[in-house]
Amino acid sequence: RFIHKCCAMQFPPTSGPTQMQVQKLPTGIEGFDDVCQGGLPVGRSTLVSGTSGTGKTVFSLHFLHNGIKDFDEPGIFVTFEESPLDILRNAASFGWNLQEMVEQDKLFILDASPDPDGQDVAGNFDLSGLIERINYAIRKYKAKRVAIDSITAVFQQYDAVFVVRREIFRLIARLKEIGVT
């Protein structure tokens, strides 16, 4: 029992094999699922962090590729930086034929990169349009896995960090509501 000054909350017991276990979604990435005791938490967002060149994009693509190939779970890849063509080429260098998965409607690459000519932001920033595009793609392709590359790119496009942060939290809440990993 946890007791605080103004209220008392009762938590379920944590002993026993079925109490408080998190259902995991296997990534199929060699060694990773062992380290994470089965994979990533189902229906939750996981932040993959690291400096440029550490393999965040490769990890995300590997997660989606294996989900489609090994578990028949369609996926969505949202890109803010690289073009879909570059993503397909990079994946091919690892022997992953993502183009075939795109053609089979098992993978959808949503290009959310900014206009190369730049953009003028007027009014309030929000991700409502992007959230709806992702939601539509999830429904259309019956996706179970979603990767967004990269959240950092969103922050770099706008000055109002607190607003972008709020919108990212809205996006994560929506993905959780939908139940994708």
Give the ranges of each region predicted by the language model:
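Conserved inter-motif catalytic segment of the P-loop NTP-binding fold
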Residues: 71-156
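Short amphipathic alpha-helical segments and helix-helix/interface helices
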Residues: 64, 135, 168-172
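Walker A/P-loop NTP-binding active-site region of P-loop NTPases
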Residues: 35-100
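Cysteine-centered motifs
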Residues: 6-7
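Substrate-engagement module of ASCE P-loop NTPases
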Residues: 157-158, 163-181
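N-terminal pre-Walker A segment at the start of P-loop NTPase domains
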Residues: 14-30
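Amphipathic alpha-helical transducer elements in NTP-driven molecular machines
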Residues: 25-29, 33, 42, 57, ...
